Amino acid sequence: MCKTATDCRVFVSQVLFQWNISLSGIKIQKCQQRYYEKKENVVCVCNATYCDEIPEVGNLQPLQAAIYQTDQYGKRFERTVSSFTETTNETGIIRLKIDSRIRFQTIIGFGGAFTDAAGININSLSESTRTNLLKSYFGSTGIQYTIGRVPIASTDFSTHAYSYDDSPNDFTLSNFSLADEDFKFKIPYIKQAVNLTGGVLKLFASPWSAPGWMKTSGQMIGGGALRGLSNGPYHVTWANHYVKFLEAYKNNGVIFWGLTVQNEPVAGADLSYKWQAMYFSPKTERDFIKNHLGPALRKSNVGRNISLMIMDDQRTQLPIWADVVLKDKEAAQYVSGIAVHWYNDFVPACTGFKPFEHRPILGDWSRGDMYAHDIIQDLSHWVSGWTDWNLCLDLKGGPNFAKNYVDAPIIVNATADEFYKQPMFYIMGHFSKFIPPGSARIELHFYVKPISYEGVAFVTPTYQRVLILLNRNNKSVTFSIEERAKDGLALRIKLKPKSIATAVWNK
């Protein structure tokens, strides 16, 4: 789960457009475009006085649909209204049908991570620009994220490695305390985000490593497992450490919905890993949950209702982790779900992660396209939520003490007091803006097997239908959408090359 920014390279042209459009009497600010390298590389520029907004769906008449389109050439959430009309026998049209009677998983939400790097970059902006950035993610005129991930202590996207208790053999955690980074770069912006969402933001926390003195390696950076026997003091203390963290954040006004046991536990087998990691196998994580973490959470006021997620690693590991952990009834009673990463698809939730692309690329469409493809495939296979990595990064793709620079949906240029919304930001919004928590995926059938296009459909808690379509072709594609409840009628949507569309209509 991740993303970041790009180097402020010389651009061929810089074009700024500032438009206001009126929708039902409300002025909506459109994308202020800036081109980089080539005309297909487009970002939307925001600063202290201006930031683009997303027009609301509004009041739709019977048979009307609001259609939002974003494409490679700079169109961003362009809203039009179309209607269901009688079906025809036209050729060259892609036919598909949805059926809201056939329902699958319920959606938890979409979001990103409140890393130190994100907080440092948000903090580098003026108050007005900072507010516009947070509104872009969490506000009603933004893409309305409903999930936030919070690292427990440091990650590589910190300026240094730190823990909450560096006192060896402190098995009572009497020296536990949050770090300056929590108070400067995490908690203030988490609380603002919670307020912007009206309190619906679900937060989950994840550790990258226990303090070094608890590990076999003796240090946070690099792999290593918890020291001692599985029933020993290090395992007990580490379980209590989660509770201490939850209590400390609650005392500062932040309540958590969920928790993962360990970020990328398999990486902890590598002692030479370049940043914080800690090893669990499926068996050792199972035993840690049932013997220590589960009971510790269950008996605490802050942890008894926590949604605990296992694995938090590459999806290729999923079958064995589910089999080993969830077949054990004692462990399974504490587990609410499974967290997976998408790195093994070679398109991680933080694109720009491969050695040859360790940097942001301003305006790059291909990375947004990879996001859209992965999200559609995940949602089509029972995934209930999708969380990105860093909310924002600087032009270099950091800060990151391990120099593991990547890309992000928003790139911050602190010198200019502005930030750039990447195509990835808008791709995320085509899902997060229109699929609220509690929505259910519904049946979507293509009459002809999709080639270079795909889609996924939902019904919201207010019974609106939401359809997302992705065109990965280099040519336009026209879709004819039928719904079982609207027999004999179809909605036509034409998608330009390299584009995504979200259609919303009433029951």
Please report, for each region that a protein language model flagged, where it lies by residue.
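Substrate-binding and catalytic surfaces of secreted/luminal carbohydrate-active proteins
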Residues: 26-94, 98, 203-205, 240-257, ...
